[in-house]
């Protein structure tokens, strides 16, 4: 079972981390707050498949949160601060959820 000191959102874990899906998906009600799992500089992006994406970078760590309804303004955010809202954007979204991934999965996922 995975646990986070600061989860990316409060919802139901619907998809786990594995080779074909190197991320965790959390189903959530649209508009549910999405939290930074670590402090860092927030930027945003849009991708046709992943929708609105929040990206937090600091000290060699990068985490991303996809399919968001809203990404908050760029800037510095502390761990636990709201960086966006759960949504259902992008063609790969199968319903309202947050697709959370990291470039260093062992940092958050213990793998």
What are these regions (language model features)?
Residues 13, 40, 80-83:
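Residue-level preference for non-acidic, small/hydrophobic
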Residues 20, 32, 61-62, 107:
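Short acidic/polar mixed-charge low-complexity motifs
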């Amino acid at each position: 079972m995975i646990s986070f000191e600061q989860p990316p959102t409060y919802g139901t874990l619907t998809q786990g981390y594995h080779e074909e899906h190197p991320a965790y998906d959390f189903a959530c009600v649209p508009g549910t707050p999405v939290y930074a799992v670590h402090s860092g500089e927030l930027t945003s992006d849009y991708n046709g498949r992943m929708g609105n994406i929040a990206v937090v970078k600091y000290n060699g760590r990068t985490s991303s949160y996809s399919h968001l309804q809203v990404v908050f303004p760029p800037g510095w955010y502390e761990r636990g601060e709201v960086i966006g809202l759960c949504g259902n954007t992008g063609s790969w979204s199968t319903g309202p959820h947050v697709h959370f991934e990291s470039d260093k999965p062992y940092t958050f996922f213990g793998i």
